[in-house]
Amino acid sequence: MIDHTGIGVADVGRSAYFYDAALGALGMRRVMQIPENVGTDGIGYGRKYPVYWIDRYHPHSAKQHTAFVARSRADVEAFYAAAIKAGGTDNGGPGQRKPNYYAAFVLDPDGNNIEAVYRGD
């Protein structure tokens, strides 16, 4: 289980638009936002507390892969559709990857590999 993770992004506004849509499809929302005047302009997403952060990255930082827990196959499909519509790039559409692992992969606007996975059924 992921407690929290974070990535650096080139354009916080563009990425916030993407993650508002993609993570909104999984029932997540912005739960914390740090003003730029405190050294960053980070946004924390989650259901109750921030588990996923975006903030302005340093040019030499590595791209990330993060998997989010989905509540159903329908959530995986909603995540994928919302992420693509918000500017993401297909990196593996919704489908069964192995027994009890239904997932979809999207590259966010900065090339980070974002996954939604449902382990039920």
Residue positions per predicted region:
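Short glycine-enriched loop/turn motifs at secondary-structure junctions
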Residues: 1, 59-62, 98
